[in-house]
Curated annotation (Swiss-Prot):
Segments crossing the lipid bilayer: none
PROSITE patterns per UniProt: PX
Subunit composition and interactions: Interacts with ATP6V1D; may play a role in ciliogenesis.
InterPro entries in the cross-refs: PX_dom, PX_dom_sf, SNX10/11
Listed SMART domains: PX
Purpose: Probable phosphoinositide-binding protein involved in protein sorting and membrane trafficking in endosomes. Plays a role in cilium biogenesis through regulation of the transport and the localization of proteins to the cilium. Required for the localization to the cilium of V-ATPase subunit ATP6V1D and ATP6V0D1, and RAB8A. Involved in osteoclast differentiation and therefore bone resorption.
Organism the protein comes from: Bos taurus
Gene of this entry: SNX10
GO molecular function: 1-phosphatidylinositol binding; phosphatidylinositol phosphate binding
Protein name: Sorting nexin-10
Length: 200
């Protein structure tokens, strides 16, 4: 194998482990674990896991579209009025659709430069806090928010972060996307992040 092939950038994303969460006595929802493993300099953390619900994905798509009007964003799985969170097939179809959405988003260099995407994938912040952080209205930066979440929720041993993609085995439900970045898209940590500017 040639040395340059070993250094090729990759981003792998998994959407897995759907869980029913109680919102209140009458209402429940499903959230999903999003796991990232990458060697891309665009990411603050090389490995991360965070839980998000469907309507947060809807917010993310709207946010990305508003910041990249000329980009045709991939579609999310449709909101099914007859969706049954106790129906395993319904839940898995949505999980797969959410994973496909993220995989396609991460293949687009312009979308990958959006700080909102990184906070969605690698922090605990809700949509309002993400918007505040990206617009500079918080005491913490994007990177600080991600690092704080990583310290609170470390899921991978430190020695694992330097390993190759195939050293991590989640399950059979996985997707990965590879892409390269020119030096024009690089900053101090490899990607020029955008900090420019509901749920259903």
């Amino acid at each position: 194998m040639f040395p340059e092939q070993q250094k090729e950038e990759f981003v792998s994303v998994w959407v897995r482990d759907p869980r029913i969460q109680k919102e209140d006595f009458w209402h429940s929802y499903i959230d999903y674990e999003i796991c990232i493993h990458t060697n891309s300099m665009c990411f603050t953390m090389k490995t991360s896991c965070v839980r998000r619900r469907y309507r947060e994905f809807v917010w993310l798509r709207q946010r990305l579209q508003s910041n990249a009007l000329l980009v045709q964003l991939p579609e999310l799985p449709s909101k099914n009025l007859f969706f049954n969170m106790n129906n395993r097939q319904h839940v898995d179809q949505r999980r797969q659709g959410l994973e496909d959405f993220l995989r396609k988003v991460l293949q687009n260099a312009l979308l990958l430069s959006d700080s909102s995407l990184h906070l969605f994938l690698q922090s605990h912040l809700n949509s309002e806090d993400i918007e505040a952080c990206v617009s500079g209205q918080t005491k913490y930066s994007v990177e600080e928010a991600i690092h704080k979440f990583a310290l609170m929720n470390r899921r991978f041993p430190e020695e694992e972060e330097g390993k190759k993609e195939n050293d991590i085995d989640y399950d059979s439900e996985s997707s990965s996307s590879g892409f390269g970045h020119s030096s024009d898209d690089s900053s101090s940590h490899g990607c020029k992040m955008s900090t420019a500017p509901q749920e259903s």
